[in-house]
Each structure stands twice: as structure tokens, then as C-alpha cells.
Amino acid sequence: MMNKLYIGNLSPAVTADDLRQLFGDRKLPLAGQVLLKSGYAFVDYPDQNWAIRAIETLSGKVELHGKIMEVDYSVSKKLRSRRIQIRNIPPHLQWEVLDGLLAEYGTVENVEQVNTDTETAVVNVTYMTREEAKLAIEKLSGHQFEDYSFKISYIPDEEVSSPSPPHRAREQGHGPGSSSQARQIDFPLRILVPTQFVGAIIGKEGLTIKNITKQTQSRVDIHRKENSGAAEKPVTIHATPEGTSEACRMILEIMQKEADETKLAEEVPLKILAHNGFVGRLIGKEGRNLKKIEHETGTKITISSLQDLSIYNPERTITVRGTIEACANAEIEIMKKLREAFENDMLAVNQQANLIPGLNLSALGIFSTGLSVLPPPAGPRGVPPSPPYHPFATHSGYFSSLYPHHHFGPFPHHHSYPEQETVSLFIPTQAVGAIIGKKGAHIKQLARFAGASIKIAPAEGPDVSERMVIITGPPEAQFKAQGRIFGKLKEENFFNPKEEVKLEAHIRVPSSTAGRVIGKGGKTVNELQNLTSAEVIVPRDQTPDENEEVIVRIIGHFFASQTAQRKIREIVQQVKQQEQRYPQGVAPQRSK
């Protein structure tokens, strides 16, 4: 697809040859024709990088016949839809910060980094609606970050310019959550590097890491802010499998050189982080896969203990010892196995027919795993690359049991509107500020991200230890909002590092169904507690409210609480269906 540029604020004296010469002088040669109008012109570039270079080099900077010319993408009003391009992003800006900024103005479907030779970064962003894209352009144009000012343009929305029937888009992989195998699946390599080597990997003014990313066509995120004071820092590498392996090899060489020069360490092992759900398949039956990799590459491979895992740290550390060449070869084989496991799991997830409408498991982003949510510059034009791997996304069995009566699909608007639910979540009083954020920024962003209403109820007294957060929204919104709140409390150290975040949640159920939740002799509630690991309390002597509802208390970690909430809602739904089937109180006959 050609990148058509608009050249504005031209003097009437300007000719097509003037423009050709000016572009040529700036080493921006025009291959196609110049379409000259009165006061403006259009030119085409087949490559997006050249188009970006022309905009950055000329717009507002070059005078032609006494007038400063303007250069931008030419996007007709009918094509000004959901896609925008943001340029002049600081090279050192953490991707997580940019993600949060974009989410303030709407639901981001896709963010694609554009590989350019400019010092600053460029991303193409697709919002869910054209209104959100318009708002983002209005609010972010000229947004100052340190000494950098964002430059934003509309770019053509391929789905608008060449519309196709919904079923074709689904088959071809357009839209979030699609499982098309035609596109490159992004499964990043995560490694741990000693903190003392981080500076060497980045290099003076970021030159070393820029060289790595340029040579390997990769994006390398060094999560320096994670685990302050820790001996090791996670690094995430997004690229093709070949690019990932080459970037990993270069990082190993830099670390070994630094270790030799500083004599800080004799050996620098390669430490790969992998989600626990994949490790069994990497090891293989009786350890055969791992032994084969060790034998073929001449390395020694060990894997961290299961005891180091928690719900907030689902990754195991795979330590590879050997020469740089041997470790690099082992990385290739290890990642082959991990990618295969990931792709199989994602295929299973996408085939699930038992999930929430429109639930994009990979994009939930409910816990801070150190992964950027920006996809890599992979995937054909117009097809968003697969979302980054989220550790909890592969638990297809967990999700299918959690949401047994909902259907997954990339087009949520094709389904009936999901039922609204209200949950009261109790958080430590001292955490209220962190949840609200500066001038309410965090809670607003969270509400937009989750698609829920989130309010913090007034304190019942001056010395209360907990405050109630009222969340209203459909099941997926509840999952996202509650998950982010659990994660935020962990991130902000309101709980000890080795302590799981356990919160109390209240849901209201019709008083007529409370007995069914308890079960005969407490059998149902006991089974529920055993199944979910949550504490479930249904007070027997509770007086129903004006809506004839009573409160069920649920106490536990995030997954435990979510499972209990879903199962209780399921019981309530079953009772409702029975009441609709037998409205006159005629109970179904039971066979003895």
C-alpha cells in the first residue's frame, strides 16, 4: 500500500519540478508523479519509513518560495477512522508508560512499533472507535515528555478503505483475538541479566542497545524499574525467532566481555524465564527433551524449583551453562519447545467455545509481569500481530470452567449484551490513594481499561482498616478490574513480597437462592471452598435488603475469588432458569 503525503501551505509559484528538486536535495527522491494543486500537492511513497522521514525532515522546517511547507499523511475524512501514528517518542520512554497514556483516551486494539532509522520511536495505534482515535489526536498532539513533543497523524484504516464482510475478516485474522496462523505469533524471549551488566547492554547514550535492535530487527525492553535492588533484571526481546536468538547471542557476548574486563564473574550463564505451564513440555517425558538439548549443544541446564512460584510469579528460571556458542544454540532449541507449547495453548484457547464474549485473554494485562503490551513490528500490513504472551492466557481449562456459559469470539458486538454485575471489593485503607492515583488518573484509566464503573465508597468511620471499592460491569470487566486491583496492591507493596494478596469480596444474591449456595448440611458451600480455595460465607440469619437480596462474602486470592464468584453466579442462574421453567412453583419430578 502506498503512503500518500499531503504537502500544504505552498506558494502559487511552486512547480512540480521545484518539489522534486527539494525532495531530492534532502535525499528523499520521489519515484512517482507529483500531483500539484493550487496551494498544495500530493506525493506517494511505497515505504512507510520514507514517508515518516519526509514528514520529519520537511514539515514546518523548510521554506519554499517564501512559505514554510507542511507535510503530513494524506487521509481523507472518510478514512480518518481508528488508526493514528505517533512520532517523536523518546527512545528511553518505558513502553508501559506509553501504554498507560494511550489507554487514557479509549480502548487500544493494537499498537505496532514501526522500525525506522530515526533516533526517536514511532508507533501505529488502532483504537476501538474513531471517536477514541479523534480524542487521542486532540489530547496527545504536542504532548510534552521531557524535551520531546509528540507528533500525531491519522493514517489510513485499511478496514475502512477496503471493507470486507465480517466473516472474511475473521478468517483472515483481522481483529483482536484472532487465531490466524498466517501471521507471526509474538512469543518474546525473557531472560535475566545481572544488574551490574545492564549499563553495558544499554551502552553510552543507548548506542549499544540501539545497535542490537537495528541489527536484529528486534525490540529489547530492559525492565530496570522492576524489583528495585534485585541482583538481576528481566529483559524481554521481541523479534522473529532468528532475530530473538541473534539479540540474545549479542547480549551474552556483551555480558561475557564486561565480566572479563571487570573480573566480576568468571562465568555468565544464560537465564531464560518461562511460564510454568510450558516447562513440563520443555523437559519432556523422563527428561528426554532437556537431555537431548544438553547433549546436542554441550550445555548443562537446570530449572528452578516449583516452590519459587506464586500466582504473581508464574515463571521458572531455566539456567544454561556453557560457552557463549553453546548457550546460544541451547536458547534456539529451548525457545522452539516453548513456542510450540505456547502456540498449542493459544490454539486451544481460541477454539474454546466457553468463554466470555470478546474476551481477549492475552490482552487482559491484569498483572505486572514485566512484559510490554506493545506488539512487535511483525505481521502483514493491516493485520495486527498476535498480542504478547500473558502468563495467565494459557490456562484454557481454568477459563473454560470459570465462564462455562459464554462464548469467545473476536467480534463482541455480534453477541447479546452481557449482564451487569456488582461486586464490592475491600482494600486496605492506606491503598486507596494508589488505586485512585494523582487527580483520579489511575482509577479513570482502570475503569476505561476494564469497561467497568469503579467507585470507592466513603469511609464508615475515621479509623477503619478497609475501604469498599464498588465495581459494576459484565463478567469480563469484573475479571479485568479486580485483577488489576489485586496486582496494584502487590506492586505497591501493601502486602509482603512472599505473601499472596487475599481480599474480601461481597456479591449479592437473591435470598431465595442462598439456601442453594449453602446446600444441604452445608455440602455445596464446602465443595465450593474445596474447589476454589476461597473462604465462602453465607450468613444464615441475614435480613434481605429492599431487593430481597443477601450478601455472600468471598475471601481469597484473585483466582480463588474469581472462581468462587463465577460458581455462585452459576448456581443463581440455574435457580432462575428453573423458576422460569416452572413459574407456578411446580417442581420437576425426581426419579427415585
UniProtKB/Swiss-Prot annotation:
**Record's comment describing the protein's domains:** Domains KH3 and KH4 are the major RNA-binding modules, although KH1 and KH2 may also contribute. The contribution to RNA-binding of individual KH domains may be target-specific. KH1 and KH2, and possibly KH3 and KH4, promote the formation of higher ordered protein-RNA complexes, which may be essential for IGF2BP1 cytoplasmic retention. KH domains are required for RNA-dependent homo- and heterooligomerization and for localization to stress granules.
Its Gene Ontology biological processes? Answer: cold-induced thermogenesis; CRD-mediated mRNA stabilization; energy homeostasis; mRNA transport; negative regulation of translation
User: Phosphoserine is carried by which residues?
Assistant: 11, 162, 164
| Claim: Nucleus is one of the keywords in the record | yes
Provide the assembly information. Can form homooligomers and heterooligomers with IGF2BP1 and IGF2BP3 in an RNA-dependent manner. Interacts with HNRPD. Interacts with IGF2BP1. Interacts with ELAVL1, DHX9, HNRNPU, MATR3 and PABPC1.
Q: Where in the cell is it found?
A: Nucleus; Cytoplasm; Cytoplasm, P-body; Cytoplasm, Stress granule
S-S bonds: none
Q: Which Pfam families match?
A: KH_1 (PF00013), RRM_1 (PF00076)
Gene Ontology, cellular component aspect: cytoplasm; cytoplasmic stress granule; cytoskeleton; cytosol; nucleus; P-body
> Is the keyword Ligase in the record?
no
Q: Which residues carry this modification: Phosphothreonine?
A: 543
Q: Which residues form the KH domain?
A: 186-251, 267-334, 420-485, 502-568
What protein does this entry describe? Insulin-like growth factor 2 mRNA-binding protein 2
Q: What is its main location?
A: nucleus
Q: In which tissues is it expressed?
A: Expressed in oocytes, granulosa cells of small and growing follicles and Leydig cells of the testis (at protein level). Expressed in testis and ovary.
> What domain of life does the native source organism fall in?
Eukaryota
Q: Which SMART domains match?
A: KH, RRM
Q: What does this protein do?
A: RNA-binding factor that recruits target transcripts to cytoplasmic protein-RNA complexes (mRNPs). This transcript 'caging' into mRNPs allows mRNA transport and transient storage. It also modulates the rate and location at which target transcripts encounter the translational apparatus and shields them from endonuclease attacks or microRNA-mediated degradation. Preferentially binds to N6-methyladenosine (m6A)-containing mRNAs and increases their stability. Binds to the 5'-UTR of the insulin-like growth factor 2 (IGF2) mRNAs. Binding is isoform-specific.
Alphabetically sorted, this entry's keywords are: Cytoplasm, mRNA transport, Nucleus, Phosphoprotein, Repeat, RNA-binding, Translation regulation, Transport
**Family of this protein:** Belongs to the RRM IMP/VICKZ family.
Quote the SUPFAM superfamilies the UniProt record gives.
Answer: Eukaryotic type KH-domain (KH-domain type I) (SSF54791), RNA-binding domain, RBD (SSF54928)
Q: Which organism is it from?
A: Mus musculus
Which Gene Ontology terms cover its molecular function? mRNA 3'-UTR binding; mRNA 5'-UTR binding; N6-methyladenosine-containing RNA reader activity; translation regulator activity
